[in-house]
Amino acid sequence: MTRKQRRLFMIFGALGTLGVAVGLILFALSDNIVFFYGPTELAEKAPHPGARLRIGGLVKPGSLEREAGQTVHFIVTDNKHDVAVTYTGLLPDLFREGQGVVTEGTLTGKETLRADSVLAKHDERYMPREVADALKKQGVWQEDGQAKPATQGAAAPLIR
């Protein structure tokens, strides 16, 4: 084997190994990738049932229903489309109708989600950036309202 052939063999071998490694990493992470949707986006381009995703919006007033045990049904809305959510577990203390929420779970129907986790906004000025962006995109964002998007990566002020 000449020097040039050996060098080409090493380069193609390294590229092949790198390709296999990237493929294995993507395969391993495919179960952890979760896409974020607003109710209108979900209605327009719904993924297949069984897909894992996050849905953000507001809890529709009057939609909260509690069953025996810890099962809760509610509707997440962006004031254009609604998504029915079923969650079994303890809701966050700040979970209320009319408040911002992000739910993560499995799509069981076109507009039905079985949630594994529910995140509620934590104070009167905070709303997850994804929810705020989705509400702005739908034209229902109120700039003078109390819902302000979180700044990503912003540090909390130091108290001395």
Swiss-Prot record:
Segments in the Periplasmic topological domain: 29-160
Transmembrane segments: 8-28
GO molecular function, one term: heme binding
Region spans: Disordered: 140-160
Topology relative to the membrane: Single-pass type II membrane protein
Family to which the UniProt record says this protein belongs: Belongs to the CcmE/CycJ family.
Task of the protein: Heme chaperone required for the biogenesis of c-type cytochromes. Transiently binds heme delivered by CcmC and transfers the heme to apo-cytochromes in a process facilitated by CcmF and CcmH.
Protein name: Cytochrome c-type biogenesis protein CcmE
Native source species: Beijerinckia indica subsp. indica (strain ATCC 9039 / DSM 1715 / NCIMB 8712)
Species classification: Bacteria, Pseudomonadati, Pseudomonadota, Alphaproteobacteria, Hyphomicrobiales
